[in-house]
Amino acid sequence: NRMEATTTAVPTGSNKSGETQTSNVKVNVSSQSSKAFSTVKDSVVSVINLQKENTGDTDNILNSIFGDSESSSSKSSSDKLQTASEGSGVIYKKSGNTAYIVTNNHVVSGSNSLEVIMSNGKKLPAKIVGTDSVTDLAVLKINSAPVTTVASFGDSDNIKVGETALAIGSPLGSEYATSLTQGIISAKKRTIETSNSNGQGTGEATVIQTDAAINAGNSGGPLINLAGQVIGINSMKLSSSGSSTSVEGMGFAIPSNEVVSVIDELVKNGKINRPALGVTLVDLTAISSDQQKSILKLPSSVTGGSVIMSVNAGPAKTAGLKKYDVVTKVDGKSIKDTAELREALYKHKVGDTVKIGYYHSGKYKTTDVKLTKTASTN
């Protein structure tokens, strides 16, 4: 007789009864990213912008009807604070009873009061030490007693395109506090136009570009490297192009080296006193090649620089700089555009003298300029 074989094998992923089971396999899930996150996470906070509640005309009418428009209850209602917006910040220094937080200026702008929420959920009142709308940075202070971790800064000049970048913050608000996203450095120095909350242009900023996800609420939080060092402060994302084309993976952070110089001065003075030439400028690349020859009379070998469009009464005028002069060097170092010119100037202090190399009617000249304050420091 022919015998049929029967299998007694248990289906893969099942126990002897045929039920699906899970395996408890021990693996080392620790990675450079998770270690870096653990190093910094307790220094990252949510920043709550509190503003006075706007009681409408309806409330005033009802109060008038019931004869208590001037009552204390009405006054307390008009003074009630509510959450206007939320962002992120990072604790970077403890000094005695005070801890200092860096965040974005636009996160705290317009606030009547501020709160921070620590990584463990504890709420603390915060006060503004100083703000700077040009770089979109602000420094806050809180009681240092609950602070267990302080972040350290890395050298943003040494980052490389393609290296891992991690963004930490509260995307969409404190409900998602201490969220981590991972990407790479897409560009080390990207020049973008900046504007304030009213949409008015405030100049240009040189920022780090990353594809680590950055959303509303991430503003003010840290961009870190795999060593757990802060290499930038997340500031903005590009969500659409000029033609309304949807854009993904384009976030920007203020480089740590610039952050450190700004926040140190904010703690010291409460504001930034920037040196200036006393001119308005435009990139040479914005001028057509025909105009470069006919109006600026530039040699064809000159491909980078910043064109003076107007000269105010001040140091540049005293030094002999004129409209349509093309600045190509500061202190002997070539500059390719207005952003690099400003970067070179901002390394100096008000009252310093810098050597400006420029072309006037096609001839290269140099002049010494004593720097003055900018018209607006905030």
Regions found by a protein language model. Name each.
Residues 84-85, 91-175, 329, 333-339, ...:
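Conserved active-site neighborhood of the chymotrypsin/trypsin-like protease fold
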